[in-house]
């Protein structure tokens, strides 16, 4: 009778979760006020509300949602184009129209039909192609507030039009509508619970369109936050939208918010509203498609009743396969890396293996002879309740599931029970135990107040729960025995070292001591230790459990079963059963599984550093707040982050969590993975690097501190795979050194820097530091400057001389360091900068000397003065003769070098003695060093020639040559800059070097001393002029010596190839344009004959690039070509003029300024007649500002034309000027007046007949300007210099 009552109560309780399986749902407005029909416990089926009684459309479908006034997506699509047609003639007209629309929509005092028409006008503009204009997107951002106001309007028609307009914008613009969508979605959600059907359905339809077409991750939190709304209709719709989002979006768009999605769906499955639960279950399938691992973890974290409801829904929708299964490939690095939670039944041999009641299981094993561990990762009480629900009235008796009759992974097994349990054969054919029905009945004698069976082996304790009743332990049933000895489960030996997945006990759960082992103490079987999970080091609490059973050593694992599983099952049997043969046989079975005769030490657990070695903590003391079911519990449960698992994806998900404690746990798990030398795959590394990049800014102190510890291990294990991430790593650590951190945290940052310096190639670090030092996007604080400089200094001490490269970035960085030696705000920066210069000088003296020789004299003086002072302070010798031209080698140079190192020094002598270079590195005293430095100083001051190799460096970088630019350590190798090929350091090479240095007298070429930044724009990265202004460089554009003749054909081909990457590779194309600008000033006629047409067309095409700096640079290059080679434009004058004038309407001032400069040069480069014939039609037909630019250009052309030619062209010139004199733009009118003044200056009174159309006031004004020009009083007017020609 008791069983029948329990069954009825449980069925009544669980029926609510089984309804609405078909997915039908009422409309949002109606369901908000629906009163559920009463249910009678006696007959729950007859009284239940039918799920389809308030039918509605399926989620996300375009069908009508019922009711008068409702709109659907078909209505929206029709309304998109059902608008008045308009035409857009110019961007200015479009801007004016959008401004008017914004004005109307921003003021709710306007009539509602005007606001509705304004919204339609936006759609009209979209249909007319407004999205093709750049200005449209600028004004669209300004419309965000107006659209939000319209969506809040009290007029339903205005709201409807606003929703349609927003949907149309999303459809047309896609992800470009990200900002607008993010702003409008919260307002659209406010429409969902509106009682006016047209408003509610319009808002829902608009959200659907946005989800389908604007895939922006920032929308996900906006949707998930509404899944916990107090409004039931909003929650229902939110899960509907979430389902649509999971169907439509790509996985990469969801990855950032995977944890939020999982948590939201879990809350939805537990939602108080039945229909919201149905919608949440639908989203589970979408989640599984994107994140199978997270979906499986979510499923296993649900209570059995919710698992059953989810399973029932998935079955009804034909998606049983979407439930988690453990036979997925475990090789995937991110999705299924040996998942600890799997749901497949263990069926090694169906004829001999008995099943268990479980939602989770262990992996299937194809080898029937191997042992399989039992599973203990479920709440058996809950499982028994689920079993009672599925049994449909059958009482829970002694029984087992016929696992052999089920397919692997079949969830139908949860619904079946058998009526008896017979003997279970083991792998050697013996029957271990035979349990009868009366034994099981003991466990079913109690039900709780909610009618659920209390049959359980191990419950999942909640914080603060106490299971102190002595009878509680004694009510456990044979299910515990089923999982121990009576029902053996085979396991794969490959998973032998994995611990069982018993859910972690929480907080302060405790069971009173008297009942713990009240039955097991008289057993004749040796009792194993059961203190598993948390040692003293890892546990925060200690146990009061002092029972003798703790003194036993644990069983040695290693024979195919997890020790925690054996312990939990055998101890459960001892606790539950009376002393006798049943207990002994059950425990003996567990002992046989472990084979205690084996003395082999088990493999260490993955998280052993936390005291979690599988047999290290048998005697550990847990705290008084901790019981057998918490951290140090007898069931072997351990904290989540200490599980013996290889699921790296789970660890990474925790590291990426928004919850700080989960991030900390993830870092703990990651530390132990790394300390056990668990290497990560390429995909895992990429994801972890992204997570770590964000963690540099982690706001939680404990997480950041642990992150720094983990980072050290990460670098040590994966240093060979992290070179691509080194820039981020190094720069972020250096920035942190400048932050206000605790001393302990600062020490950890310093340790990470030390490990980084030791782990990566020195040359790579050096290049990154040089790049970071001159990065114009960074504004380092004084502390960061000190950190950078100290790191460079320390790095220089361990670098090999060949690691120091004289590249453009190095030159710029050294210049920056020299400026830091005079930092007025910090003496620490000054000292650190001085130390860096000295370290670099000592690292590679010849190369550093060459570098200083390329810098302006100001920098040379500062550096050499510093080096003199340093040597004067450190040396005890006196200054030697200036005629001793010893050059100083690097102190750390290899001792077996056979050829000398020479620096580009120039001495007061005309010849260099070979003996002067025969020295021993170790025997150089401070006097020699000082003498060497004096020679270096003189060389720098007299240095007026760069080696041809150095000169050609910015033009074409040869990797082989670049490698050779530094000092070589092999025998017979000399500094390539020392003249070359001498393998034995012979006199000819040195004489060649000396003659090279003396080939030009001091200042023989004025340009030889000028520093040109373009010469050093090599392949590392570009540097703009602002970078050089800070270093006070000479910014002339002078180039190489005139006698430098190089074949640039290959280079031009490479540049053209790079420039053809339109809208891509912005930085690389900047470099290419700078290089091209240099080439324009060289007289390489053969190159220009071959490539001019291609260069011109590419430049003109680049004027349409999306990057404004690229457009501006292209105009500057065009200007340089016009200035140096104007004759080549004869056949391309019209095209060039048109493109240059069109650039004047660019929205960026920098581009317009460059266009004005190019037009000015163009006016003086092309023949006047040709130029005027091109300009006249443009002046008459073009709009502002193109016509203004054309008039100004024509004015410049007229100034250089002869009187006869101008008289001939006057009939073509005057109509445009007369027309422009009437223009609505005052600037155009003014430009026409100046142009007429210029014409008058050339031809005089012959102009008057052509002015007959002008009114008296205009003639009067024109005469006034003409008189001013003639008297020279025009001042700054462009006609002021015309008076001499009149």
Swiss-Prot record:
- SMART domains, from UniProt? TOG (SM01349)
Region: Golgi localization, residue numbers:
1-40
Q: Name one GO cellular component term.
A: microtubule
Q: Which Gene Ontology MF annotations are present?
A: microtubule binding; microtubule plus-end binding
Signal sequence residues: none
Keyword set, alphabetical order: Cell cycle, Cell division, Cell membrane, Cell projection, Centromere, Chromosome, Cytoplasm, Cytoskeleton, Golgi apparatus, Kinetochore, Meiosis, Membrane, Microtubule, Mitosis, Phosphoprotein, Repeat
Q: In which tissues is it expressed?
A: Highly expressed in brain and at low levels in heart, kidney and lung.
Residue span of region TOG 1? 66-317
InterPro entries named among the record's database cross-references = ARM-like, ARM-type_fold, CLASP_N_dom, TOG
Using the UniProt record, give the first listed, main subcellular location.
cytoplasm
GO biological process, alphabetically ordered: cell division; cell migration; establishment of cell polarity; establishment or maintenance of cell polarity; exit from mitosis; fibroblast migration; Golgi organization; meiotic cell cycle
The outcome of changing residue 6 to S is: Impairs Golgi localization
Annotated region described as TOG 2, given as residue ranges: 642-873
Identify residues that carry Phosphoserine: 14, 20, 322, 333, 336, 374, 376, 413, 461, 465, 469, 484, 495, 513, 531, 535, 570, 572, 581, 614, 620, 884, 944, 947, 1005, 1021
| Biased composition regions of type Low complexity, renumbered to the chain | 322-340, 459-473, 620-634
Locate the region Required for cortical localization.
1009-1286
Q: Region Interaction with microtubules, MAPRE1 and MAPRE3: list its residue ranges.
A: 450-565
Which ranges does the UniProt record give for the HEAT repeats? 179-214, 215-251, 256-293, 702-739, 764-801, 1046-1083, 1090-1127, 1208-1245
* Feature: compositional bias, Polar residues: 341-352, 872-884, 893-914
Domain comment, in the record's words?
A: The two SXIP sequence motifs mediate interaction with MAPRE1; this is necessary for targeting to growing microtubule plus ends. Two TOG regions display structural characteristics similar to HEAT repeat domains and mediate interaction with microtubules.
* Record's function text: Microtubule plus-end tracking protein that promotes the stabilization of dynamic microtubules. Involved in the nucleation of noncentrosomal microtubules originating from the trans-Golgi network (TGN). Required for the polarization of the cytoplasmic microtubule arrays in migrating cells towards the leading edge of the cell. May act at the cell cortex to enhance the frequency of rescue of depolymerizing microtubules by attaching their plus-ends to cortical platforms composed of ERC1 and PHLDB2.
Q: What family does this belong to?
A: Belongs to the CLASP family.
Tell me the protein's name: CLIP-associating protein 2
Lineage of this protein's species?
Eukaryota, Metazoa, Chordata, Craniata, Vertebrata
